[in-house]
Regions:
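Charged helix-capping and loop-helix junction motifs
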Residues: 8-11, 106
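His/Asp/Glu-enriched, well-ordered alpha-helical/loop segment
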Residues: 11-96, 112-114
């Protein structure tokens, strides 16, 4: 669900049992591909729309960005860390100036988190990114292929 739809109808959708997700869709919308920025924008825009500083629920937005997104993509086995579930996770460095002081970890992540805080990502138990480096991935080849596709569809 895009941030505008989530902002406009979030409560109604939740009451109807519709799972909400947070995502990015590339250069056509904002070019950042930054989930932290998306969560922040949803919360801030919700507050502005409702003219109420308490309108946004950081817990609900974080849940939509994690478990909600997994469910919406048809991956209920990736919605939490538990035996028998996929080991998909992100390790965040909390010992950075933008994450201090820690009063409420969820609010810190949603309002202050940044992609530069990511130290590790794991997908299905395999570490794909660690300390600023993609492992076992030729990023230059990926960039080249992406540009080829863009050039072809332009």
């Amino acid at each position: 669900v895009g941030s505008e739809m989530c902002i406009r109808d979030r409560e109604k959708m939740l009451q109807m049992g519709i799972p909400l997700a947070v995502g990015t869709d590339g250069p056509s919308s904002n070019n950042a591909l930054d989930m932290f920025r998306e969560m922040y924008l949803i919360c801030v825009l919700q507050k502005l729309r409702e003219k109420n500083a308490a309108a946004a629920d950081a817990n609900a937005i974080l849940k939509a960005a994690t478990a909600g997104s997994a469910r919406c993509m048809g991956l209920p086995e990736a919605d939490c860390i538990a035996p028998g579930k996929l080991a998909d996770l992100t390790v965040i460095d909390l010992h950075r100036p933008n994450m201090q002081p820690i009063n409420n970890i969820t609010k810190n992540l949603v309002y202050s988190g940044a992609k530069t805080n990511v130290r590790l990502t794991m997908v299905d138990g395999r570490i794909l990114y660690e300390n600023g480096r993609f492992l076992n991935t030729d990023t230059d080849e990926i960039y080249k292929n992406a540009q080829t596709v863009i050039d072809r569809i332009r």
